[in-house]
Amino acid sequence: MKSFIVGLVSAVAVSSVLARDNIQIAGSSTVLPFASIVAEEFGNSFSQFKTPIVGSGGSSGGIRQFCQGTGANTIDIANSSRKIKDKELKACAEKGVKNVIEVKIGYDGIVFASRRDSNKFELTTDHIAAAAKGNAKTWNEIDPKLPKQEIMLIIPASNHGTREVFEHKALGCKKECPLRQDGRIIEIAGDYTETLSKLNIDKNAVGVFGLSFYDSNRDKLQVATVNGVTPSAKTIETGEYPISRPLYFYIKGEHVGVIPGIKEYAQFFLSDMTSGNGSPLDKAGLVPLNDSERKEQLAKLK
């Protein structure tokens, strides 16, 4: 009798997953525009599958949703601008998500941008750390070579993977990262469009963005150099630009073969025509994987 009940519960769980026939994705605001392009192209190219639904919510928020369990009411893929943490994998496993497939999709840089009618900045990581953690009121108090301009930093909130990379690579924080609390830092829980609106309001504001978002808004923004390097696809690819990071999505292995099209979507995303040199994602600002990296990631999906 006990084995019958266990089998019945398993059958109900599987059938509830089968009740949904479209891929559901959430997570990183940085990955969002890339995933949206791929989802639309995937829907157009594969008539047998429905167009995936892509949402945002930040890397941490997406992974949190991803780890809520398996079934039709949970997402299939989490986009992330950082690697998943061990504690998140543990949380996933506790909810039955034990087969987490990590897929690296390319690279992006974190840039510091301001309005085009504002001062130009030539920053170092030390300048950025002093502005975020110190008590200077103007940039030239940190370094006389910097503009005499009020410090106002618009940064991603803690639900974004960009925030963690910013703290680690720009501010030099290893674990805890106490920031100034005097109103000169504004944290944005929403996406980059919200950061952009803050810059539109305040000429002094310097915003933290992904390179791809800046590339899409060059008519409105100017970008700072960091350690003497201008952020670009080339300087990120070569490693010259100091604040860059790989981008990922995470697949719920338990849903592969149950929710239609997950494997095909991932392979389509990683295909050279979708995310390689000269591809739609390359043109949208994603720095492509090299050939060996692409081959390695595709091997995970066989």
Please annotate each region the language model reported.
Residues 1-8:
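Sec-dependent signal peptide recognition
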Residues 8-11, 292:
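N-terminal low-complexity, Ser/Thr/acidic repeat segments characteristic of secreted
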Residues 19-302:
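Exported/periplasmic ABC-transporter solute-binding proteins
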